[in-house]
Amino acid sequence: KEKLEKYFKLTETALTEVKKNIISGKESNAKEIIDMVGNYISDAHHFENKDDWVNAFAALNYAHGWLDAGARIRLFKVNDSRLFTVDDES
């Protein structure tokens, strides 16, 4: 449960970061990613409330995967390697 709380915080922090850093002209695609992430986080909370830690953790991993994908295809201008699989200053 402690790890789950850690990953909720990490993923929710990353989501907040991408919402503030959408690259101009890519808002529509970014919104799709953000919506999917929100859905998976919601699912994770649902599973957590049912004490289904495995599926809660899986949903969080999917959520974060969507964030990383959006960062990699440059929908978001992010460069925090603690939150994303990119660390690009350009």
Describe the role of every protein-language-model region.
Residues 1-90:
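Long, charged/polar, soluble alpha-helical segments
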